[in-house]
């Protein structure tokens, strides 16, 4: 199943790019802490900490830092992991399946090979229309787009 086959949901925000990079390199950048730190936050923000256990039920913690030093942690769990093809994660739970105070989204990232290229799709499914609108107003397309550029640049060097 490709990302295009997934049913659209009214509360989805989606970014899709056809990249001249093999899927395995993109997947590494999404799963290896040292690589995540190099691309996951839109510049001038940075990633100060990554702690992840990439398996279904495994935890994820990524802390982004503003240029002024403000830290913004994002934690959750992986729901589905298909190496080099698909990652599904949510912030509805934290480590140990503890319910989060305020769930915001579920991320579905796919890496679909197309010849020598990869169709990269980041789909963010929100719990409700208000959360979707808030994320879009925060700059989803600009921020995730910039991060995708940073991801592609890093993956091309691997």
Spell out what each predicted region is.
Residues 92-96, 123-130:
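Short, solvent-exposed aromatic-acidic interface loops
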Residues 127-158:
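A conserved amphipathic terminal alpha-helix motif
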Residues 23-24, 53-55, 79-86, 110-119:
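A short, structured loop/turn motif at beta-sheet edges
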Residues 14-15, 34-71:
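Short beta-edge strand/loop motif at the mouth of beta-sheet-based domains
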Residues 17, 49-52, 74-80, 104-113:
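Hydrophobic/aromatic beta-strand elements that line small-molecule binding cavities or substrate pockets
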Residues 1-46:
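Hydrophobic ligand-binding cavity/cleft-lining segments
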Residues 59-90:
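Helix-adjacent hinge/juxtasegments
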Residues 26, 36, 60, 78, ...:
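Hydrophobic pocket/interface hotspot
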């Amino acid at each position: 199943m490709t990302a295009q086959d997934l049913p659209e949901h009214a509360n989805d925000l989606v970014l899709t790019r056809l990249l001249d990079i093999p899927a395995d390199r993109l997947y590494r950048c999404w799963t290896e802490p040292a690589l995540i730190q190099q691309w996951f936050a839109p510049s001038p923000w940075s990633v100060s900490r990554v702690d992840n256990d990439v398996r279904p039920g495994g935890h994820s913690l990524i802390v982004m830092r503003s240029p002024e030093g403000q830290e913004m942690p994002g934690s959750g769990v992986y729901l589905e992991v298909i190496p080099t093809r698909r990652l599904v994660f949510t912030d509805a739970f934290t480590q140990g399946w503890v319910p989060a105070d305020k769930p915001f989204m579920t991320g579905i990232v796919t890496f679909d090979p197309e010849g020598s290229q990869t169709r990269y799709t980041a789909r963010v499914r929100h719990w409700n229309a208000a959360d979707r609108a808030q994320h879009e107003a925060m700059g989803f397309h600009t921020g995730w787009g910039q991060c995708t550029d940073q991801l592609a640049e890093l993956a091309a060097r691997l």
